[in-house]
């Protein structure tokens, strides 16, 4: 069967720059990669065709030969035109295809251990003051029998006889030698003849471990604490991953936190709001007295400096802001109701101008609104 033109395969012109070729290759490789089209023979054939076109058109020597001789340049025996191969393709997939599907160059390194995440719930008090907590996590630990090698005690992994430890083998394609991952050792460069009886050659075993985690004062929801090397053990002696402790602060019954400031609502009765006085308000360090001036309205904020949260990164401490809520009295006796009626009369009715300036302003605005509508 005649082979399609490589430029046509990638959908680029014969004058396309390498950047355009790589872009086209990435797009098509994503579409036809076998991992995305399992069992689809047509997609697999298409992918091989795309790969072959890319290998030729991104190599200056190969591309020149292809432009001159076409596919004949790569058939066994070739055109005999002073062209004697040796191009190294070990970085083709590292530079382009590896970015998409995780391929690598040369011998594969043993994989670093996976990072782990632990969600930790804290009370507001614990988050503000700091705390040390013990946690228990399931993980993969280095095998204590083979010490991560995967080989039976007293033995060592052997150098792969196929690739001689390089993790790569060369295959001839016409004039050219193409490097591929060794199919015998899967790119590791070593083989385990006698696997460890405990980890069965993996170098890691499942375990649970207990850690003591120091939470610094001032942390908040969303903060992460990194414990280096406390993640899963790496493969065959590779470095371990890290453990990330994700902080979540529970809702507090009294305080709300915004940054390093704390907020709380303080209810007072309308007599205290009108006449003023002194009340006790809570802080994280205990109760403190707060002076309420006369004629205090709902929503007024009182700032208590330095009664908030100290920044986890050092520096100044936040404040406590107390928001006053003036409560309407309930469960009134007949006598209290009469007293309130007398008080209302003394105000000059519900919209008393002198004693309720905001009410007068509001009702004056309402009256003007309706007057304007009827004009």
Swiss-Prot record:
The keyword Zinc-finger applies. Keywords: Chaperone, Cytoplasm, DNA replication, Metal-binding, Repeat, Stress response, Zinc, Zinc-finger. Residues 5-70 form the J domain. Gene3D superfamilies: DnaJ domain, Heat shock protein DnaJ, cysteine-rich domain, Urease metallochaperone UreE, N-terminal domain. GO terms for cellular component: cytoplasm. CXXCXGXG motif repeats lie at residues 143-150, 160-167, 182-189, 196-203. The keyword Chaperone applies. It is found in: Cytoplasm. This is Chaperone protein DnaJ. It comes from Salmonella arizonae (strain ATCC BAA-731 / CDC346-86 / RSK2980).
């Amino acid at each position: 069967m005649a082979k399609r033109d490589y430029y046509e395969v990638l959908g680029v012109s014969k004058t396309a720059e390498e950047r355009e070729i790589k872009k086209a290759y990435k797009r098509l490789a994503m579409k036809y990669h076998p991992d995305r089209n399992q069992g689809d023979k047509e997609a697999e054939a298409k992918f091989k065709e795309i790969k072959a076109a890319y290998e030729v058109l991104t190599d200056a020597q190969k591309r020149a030969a292809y432009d001159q001789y076409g596919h004949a340049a790569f058939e066994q025996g070739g055109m005999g035109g002073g062209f004697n191969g040796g191009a190294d393709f070990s970085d083709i997939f590292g530079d382009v295809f590896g970015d998409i599907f995780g391929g690598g160059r040369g011998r594969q390194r043993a994989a670093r251990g996976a990072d782990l995440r632990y969600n930790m719930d804290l009370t507001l008090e614990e988050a503000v003051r700091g705390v040390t907590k013990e946690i228990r996590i399931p993980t993969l630990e280095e095998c204590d029998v083979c010490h991560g090698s995967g080989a039976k005690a007293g033995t060592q992994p052997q150098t792969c006889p196929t690739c001689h430890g390089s993790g790569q083998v060369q295959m001839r394609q016409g004039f050219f030698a193409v490097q591929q991952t060794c199919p015998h050792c899967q790119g590791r460069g070593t083989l385990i003849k006698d696997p460890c009886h405990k980890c069965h050659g993996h170098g890691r075993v499942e375990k649970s471990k207990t850690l003591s985690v120091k939470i610094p004062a001032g942390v908040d929801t969303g903060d992460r604490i990194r414990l280096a090397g406390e993640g899963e053990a790496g493969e065959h002696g590779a470095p371990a991953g890290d453990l990330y402790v994700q902080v979540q602060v529970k809702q507090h019954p009294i305080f709300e936190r915004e940054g390093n400031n704390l907020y709380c609502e303080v209810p007072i009765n309308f007599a205290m709001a009108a006449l003023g006085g002194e009340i006790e308000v809570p802080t994280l360090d205990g109760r403190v007295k707060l002076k309420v001036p006369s004629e205090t309205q709902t929503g007024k904020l009182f700032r208590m400096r330095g009664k908030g949260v100290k920044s986890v990164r050092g520096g100044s401490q936040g404040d406590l802001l107390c928001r006053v809520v003036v409560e309407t009295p309930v469960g009134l006796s007949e006598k209290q109701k009469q007293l309130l009626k007398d008080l209302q009369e003394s105000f000059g009715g519900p919209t008393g101008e002198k004693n309720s300036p905001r009410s007068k302003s509001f009702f004056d605005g309402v009256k003007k609104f309706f007057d304007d509508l009827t004009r």
